[in-house]
A protein has these predicted regions:
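Noncatalytic partner-interaction/assembly domains of nucleic-acid and motor enzyme complexes
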Residues: 1-113
Length: 115
């Protein structure tokens, strides 16, 4: 078990799974509605993934279009772009995912890891 330093909670985690969820939300328009109310930022162990998910949720709730460019701009506006690894990190994460086919299952696993 590891500790998320931002939320000071201890839980098992899977960084690849976190990135799969975030990447799917960046590449497919229908992805964020599937996880927006099922996942909470504190369910992400990796700080960068937590910050990216916070930005994704805010964009979704504000009805903003989500893709790697708009997410980059949102993170920059929040002063978090460098903290998450910059635009190349966003591209790296999104390039690891080819579809959101297993997104709901991945979200379920993240929830289970957090409990």
């Amino acid at each position: 078990m590891k500790m998320n330093m931002m939320t000071e909670t201890t839980f098992s985690h899977d960084s690849d799974l976190e990135e799969a969820v975030i990447g799917a939300c960046m590449i497919e328009r229908a992805a964020m509605p599937l996880v927006a109310d099922k996942l909470r930022p504190e369910m992400f162990y990796e700080e960068k993934n937590l910050e990216i998910f916070v930005a994704l949720q805010a964009m979704y709730r504000s009805a903003k279009s989500i893709d790697s460019i708009t997410l980059k701009n949102e993170l920059a506006a929040r002063g978090k772009l460098d903290a998450v690894g910059g635009p190349y990190e966003l591209l790296r994460i999104s390039s690891k995912v080819s579809s959101s086919a297993h997104l709901e299952y991945h979200a379920l696993i993240l929830r289970q890891l957090h409990t």
